[in-house]
Amino acid sequence: MEGQLLRGLAAQQDCSIREKIDLEIRMREGIWKLLSLSTKKDQVLHAVKNLMVCSARIQAYTAELQKSKEEIANQTGARLVLDSSSENKEGESCRGKIALSDIRIPLMWKDSDHFSNKECTQRFAIFCLFRMGAQVFDTDMVIVDQTVTDICFENVTIFNEAGPDFQIKIEVYSCSAEESSLTNTPRKLAKKLKTSISKATGRKISAALQEESPEACLLAGSVAGAKYHLLAHTTLTLENAGDCFKTHNLSVHGDEECSFWLPLYGNVCCRLVAQPACMAADAFAGFLNEQQTGKGLVGWRRLYCALRGGKLRCFYGPEEIEAKVEPALVVPIDKETRIQAVEKDSKKMHCFSVLSTAAGRAVSHIFAADSLADFQEWMGAFRQHFFDLSQWKHCCEELMRIEIMSPRKPPLFLAKEATSVYYDMSIDSPVKLESVTDIIQKKIGETNRQFLIGRDDQSAAPPWAAVFDGNHEMVIEKKVLSPIGEPAPDGKRKKRRAPLPPTDQPPFCIKTQGRANQSKDSATQAGVSGASSSPSDPRLSPPTHHLQKPVAAPRKLLPARKNSSADIGHTDTKTSLDAKPVPVPRQKSIRDILDPRSWLQAQV
């Protein structure tokens, strides 16, 4: 039964690996199709790089699958499998995370190459490949020329489930990024071969192109002009891990005669961080009773203890860990710590002592478990923790932080050149300044210098334009204002009463008759209109004073208007009338004066 369970777990692991292999195969087929349609140098370089990464992952998964099959085949019985697995489990250390970041590869150019010919420098495409067991990762591709002194990769690569015996192989690949070497993609190369050789061979190549896998026509990774070559490599282990930048040696391949060669300094600088699980999480946690002695008395206090990172932290409850409360007691657990069982106490049976060194002196603590099972679990956790500390070595002295960098902007040499951006811009201006000037000059010539921007060409000229247009006869007419056309006074303004008639003069009376009064009334109206239009005429002012209709004057004088000469004249007339007021009889209204019956009474 146990053997079947183990076989089932192995089968699930094999199924997971096969799914990964199928995924990489589908991705590789898609990359081949994109590569056959790529025409730009950046597209070809990225496609070939991704193709190499997929092939490397397929090889790693295949090797892992073959290794698991061999392990299952070597096991002959279920009992043997169980025994060996339990033995291996006791001898295995905890897993951990490995982070590789901030890779710098210095270059060593000649002075003549670095400081001269900056406009015509050779460019190279560089990327790194990291391998650890079945895990394969890559970095971004960067473009390097003779003006660059360091190859920089800003990626943060994290390997999960790594053991203390890990080995990370760093491979640096290079490819020439010249235009002339990147023009031939697989399909284009095959078409050229088809047209340059015999028809029979051309048909074979055409049939090969119709197949799903382009590898039938051309070998993988050997695309003409876009092949990456191994430039340098190195292997990093636990000894190279640290919480700071370190320099490691590189094994360089090739020489100056190779097209992909770069003058490497022979070193790589990076930050390799190892974070064991026993440092990042609790190895074991549970309740323990600590013995306390004072003044000859022995007491026990119950604490919740957590074993992590070479320390036994004791709290009064598990909720204090979530609240990030300072522990009540911290006991160091390192390679110098000694743990042993003590004699059975009358009250506490499962006791053990922890002898550690603190501040240069030995300190002993006695703990008791609640049951035998808890006691055995704690003893096993201490043994495993000691084994993990011995395997991960200096990585367990202090927790190393893994910094996951936020996405940054691409380096300057990856950005598009300013000249190409300028040429790609499309300035579609509907009208240019020169064309506007030409249109204005043309309009001025057609309209005999009378063109006005924003007006209609056929619009009539203003009346005052004749004054400035040569010698012309002009007729100026006075504008006669009738009383009917005058605007009505504002009803909102306050009016004042007319002054009282003087007492030393007799009241005015009308001595005319019949139609003579009617003609006199018409003459009076004409005189009033003439006086309002031209007050300076002395012939019109006397009848105006004698026959003017009494109108109540306003209480407050209005300000004189300056808009027209007629208003100024009217104001002067009012001023003269106010200076010499003529009394008007208030006993009769205009209706009584115009009534014929009043004329008869006057004659009598």
UniProtKB/Swiss-Prot annotation:
Domain called PH: residue spans: 281-387
Highest rank taxon of the organism: Eukaryota
One Pfam match: PH
Residue stretches in coiled coil: 53-79
CDD domains given in the database record: PH_rhotekin2
Segments for region (Disordered): 481-590
Gene Ontology biological-process annotations: hemopoiesis; negative regulation of intrinsic apoptotic signaling pathway; positive regulation of cell population proliferation; positive regulation of NF-kappaB transcription factor activity; positive regulation of non-canonical NF-kappaB signal transduction; signal transduction
Keywords: Coiled coil
Species: Mus musculus
Protein name, as recorded: Rhotekin-2
REM-1 domain boundaries: 1-74
Biased composition (Low complexity): 529-543
Function field: May play an important role in lymphopoiesis.
PANTHER family: ANILLIN/RHOTEKIN RTKN, RHOTEKIN-2
Origin organism lineage: Eukaryota, Metazoa, Chordata, Craniata, Vertebrata
GO cellular component: cytoplasm; nucleus; plasma membrane
Skewed-composition ranges (Polar residues): 514-527
